[in-house]
Design a protein with these regions (language model features):
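Glycine-rich phosphate-binding active-site loops on the catalytic face of alpha/beta enzymes
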Residues: 99-107, 158-170, 215-235
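Hydrophobic faces of well-ordered beta-strands that scaffold small-molecule active sites
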Residues: 2-8, 49-51, 76-80, 96-100, ...
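Catalytic cores of alpha/beta
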Residues: 84-93, 144-154, 199, 203-217
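Alpha-helix-loop-beta-strand connector modules within alpha/beta enzyme cores
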Residues: 58-84, 118-138, 175-199, 242-247
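Glycine-rich, proline-tolerant flexible connector loops at the mouths of alpha/beta enzymes
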Residues: 47-67, 72, 102-115, 163-174, ...
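Histidine/lysine/aspartate-rich catalytic loop segments that bind and position anionic ligands
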Residues: 136-189, 193
Length: 248
């Protein structure tokens, strides 16, 4: 069975759109609460929760993560950059796993995979430090053979393949098949290297039909489409629907 990790970042995005200048990020009239929505997602069948604490704190705050941990029922996958500050925060929070991602302050969302090869010394240092503190680390990368090999070289136990190009190409059959084959080859190489392979970015209720055909996929991390659907159907139904699609 393919596992479903639910990314809750955009619950925090909605809150910050209205209350980012408040001294507190929760309580009283400040809503929605990312921690509460994460608990709802767990009750609805999520196998894990992903939260991305960015350096610019544009959505999820450290306090959101800590509050979620108070009552969490599954596991926390914390997305962070490789900065010294964020690595220290990860060690303080002690999530069940960390996923290292690139960050660009001008981007709306993560635009591509981490360049592990081009930052291999720092990536190796971060993986070693977090692993020594009992936190397994994955690398959010494009399905590029060199990036997969670099991830294996530094001792990352798994990777998350960036599916954004596939998601954008879904409505163009020629491009869709090309991107799906690229992901499939990335999956094959990852497995040969002994990596566990997750995937995510841009997966929705339509293109998941193609994405789930990837052999050996362990887990999808999905956020925006689930949160978007929840505005119509509620978060519990949105998680349950995605869970059922993965199980078909």
């Amino acid at each position: 069975m393919i596992l479903l990790g639910v990314n809750i970042d955009h619950v925090a995005t909605l809150r910050q759109a209205r209350y980012r200048d408040e001294e507190e990020t929760f309580g009283g009239f400040i809503e929605p609460d990312p921690a509460e929505m994460a608990w709802v997602a767990e009750e609805a069948g999520a196998d894990g929760i992903t939260m991305h604490v960015r350096e610019d704190r544009r959505h999820v705050q450290v306090e959101d993560v800590k509050r979620y941990q108070e009552k969490m029922k599954t596991r926390l996958n914390l997305e962070i950059s490789m900065s010294l500050e964020m690595v220290q925060i990860a060690q303080e929070i002690q999530p069940e796993s960390v996923c290292l991602v690139p960050e660009n302050r001008k981007e709306v969302t993560t635009e591509g995979g981490l360049d592990v090869r081009g930052n291999i010394e720092r990536a190796h240092e971060v993986v070693r430090e977090l692993t020594q503190n009992g936190i397994p680390v994955s690398m959010f990368i494009d399905p590029d053979p060199d990036q997969l090999e670099a991830s294996a070289e530094i001792g990352a136990p798994w990777v998350e393949l960036h599916t954004g190009s596939f998601a954008r190409a879904w409505y163009n059959p020629e491009k869709r098949d090309l991107e799906l084959n690229t992901l499939r080859e990335g999956m094959r190489i990852g497995v040969e290297l002994g990596l566990r392979v997750n995937a995510g970015h841009g997966i929705n209720y339509e293109n998941v039909e193609g994405a789930k055909t990837l052999e050996s996929i362990y887990e999808f991390n999905i956020g925006h489409s689930i949160i978007s659907r929840s505005l119509r159907t509620g978060l519990a139904e949105s998680v349950q629907k995605m869970r059922s699609l993965l199980n078909e």
